[in-house]
Amino acid sequence: MAQTLYTGTGRRKTSVARVRVLPGDGRITVNGRPVEEYFPRVTHQRAVRAPLELLDAAGRYDVVAKIEGGGPTGQAEALRHGIARALAEESPEARGELKAAGLLTRDARAVERKKYGLKKARKRPQFSKR
């Protein structure tokens, strides 16, 4: 018999995390490496574990994720979003808790594009009155 498997896709900025959550002992693997090795910063590790700790499920599930694109913060938050979606799929009661904590909401903020005639997205060239 195949073991139960829950999937979720998380996105943040330009990062996409494809997440699989399965019953286990709490191991989190990202692109074939342990989460502590992949995300050395404690803030990123905390962000990744947030959905599991909210539901007191940290030692009950293993997480296997493949992440593409973006930088470390975008990747960590994409992974958090993917884990939250997978846990919501696993347990409909947990969905309300995750939603209230804002973990199921896709953070739509992204870098604003640069416009022609400007130095950056909004920075204008210096103006000389005379």
Swiss-Prot record:
One cellular component (GO) term of this entry: small ribosomal subunit
One GO process term, biological-process aspect: translation
Ribosomal protein is among the record's keywords: yes
GO molecular function, one term: structural constituent of ribosome
One Pfam family linked to the record: Ribosomal_S9
Keyword Metal-binding recorded: no
Protein keywords: Ribonucleoprotein, Ribosomal protein
Top-rank taxon: Bacteria
Annotated NCBIfam families: PRK00132.1
The family this protein is said to belong to: Belongs to the universal ribosomal protein uS9 family.
Listed name of the protein: Small ribosomal subunit protein uS9
Protein's organism: Rubrobacter xylanophilus (strain DSM 9941 / JCM 11954 / NBRC 16129 / PRD-1)
Taxonomic lineage from the root: Bacteria, Bacillati, Actinomycetota, Rubrobacteria, Rubrobacterales
Gene: rpsI
